[in-house]
Amino acid sequence: MKLLIVDDEELTRTGLISSIDLDSLGITEILQADDGVNGLEMARLYKPEIILCDVRMPRMTGIAMLERLEKFLPDSIPIFMSGYSDKEYLKAAIKLKAINYI
């Protein structure tokens, strides 16, 4: 199973990678992108089953990225993460069937 991590902070991406128990989750490949535009391209190319992404990023938000990906990867599992508690982002994440918002 492929995991795509999309976050504009490299430290966050590397921290997540080092803390995720890949074997227990069945993850065989980790992909990374530094914003929504690059995340969209990586997702289209590699078709990850799980997408873990930040909500607020430069160039394209995680919400906008996953709205566009819904057409191409309707079965992917989105998980949003954010340091913000904005209710509008949370509502948008729920609409996109995010399994979690952390």
Q: Where are the regions a protein language model picked out?
A:
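CheY-like receiver
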Residues: 40-102
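Conserved Asp/Asn-Gly motif in the active-site loop of CheY-like receiver
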Residues: 30-37
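Switch/coupling loops of ABC transporter nucleotide-binding domains
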Residues: 1, 28, 76
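Short helix-capping segments at alpha-helix termini
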Residues: 22-26, 72-74
